[in-house]
Amino acid sequence: MDIEIKYVTFKDFRGDEYIITFPSYMTHSELAESVVELSDEFLKPISGGFIENGECVGESISLNLKSRGEQDTLLLKKMRNQR
């Protein structure tokens, strides 16, 4: 059984971007609200969607944000390479 993976991309006041992946039992808005609150509103959601075959696609209905496609995919790959 494959688990569907979602993501939200955040931007800070300096313009730096961060991508967070999470399982499908959470909504995009639940994850984003938690991150924004924990960061004292330092981070703001700018895109969201799903990860399919290593690519960022789709949209977040609960956040009313679309995937930025290749831009989010490159950020995801960069994040994974930093581990």
Indicate residue ranges for each PLM-predicted region.
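Intrinsic low-complexity, intrinsically disordered or marginally ordered coil/linker segments
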Residues: M1-R83
